[in-house]
């Protein structure tokens, strides 16, 4: 299966109030492996860049002045994502902008060009309820290095999201599943086992406690740091 990991940067939050896309980054996965194919454009938004938005991604009007407008790269974007499931973190945001950009050109919405969308934010909220699930949070949770991410950037964020997506959906191939939602559903449908409530509690004796402490010391010595559960 072909996936396109996609991210955008914009002039603001409201595509229906004149905000525009200023950067798009896409990475292709084929059967869960990066193919090396990417798509990346900076775009002239044909309007001013609010300072609040520039503070997030660092893109300002002088840098974007000589970049192509969306209309001139729209066909390349559609061709790149054609027939692929698109993976986005907080999909309604990016899809709202992409749909509006194509609507301005009198073309069908972006969502009609693709067979499906995976929203990693929704999947993360199901996997980690009650926790923060921003891209940075997921990188930290899955041990993905992101210390080079000082500002938001569409291609950089797509690269990080590709790693997060693969970490979140690891094992899908073995289960014969195409979507993270299916994996989560299979986990949530597991039958509960009811254990008796009068189980006898066995406490460790002094010898067992001593041996356990020796084992922890040996682990700390070999790893050159205390076991993570003691930190």
Predicted features along the sequence, with ranges:
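Long, acidic, intrinsically disordered low-complexity segments
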Residues: 93-120, 207-231
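Acidic two-metal-ion nuclease catalytic site recognized across multiple nuclease folds
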Residues: 167-231
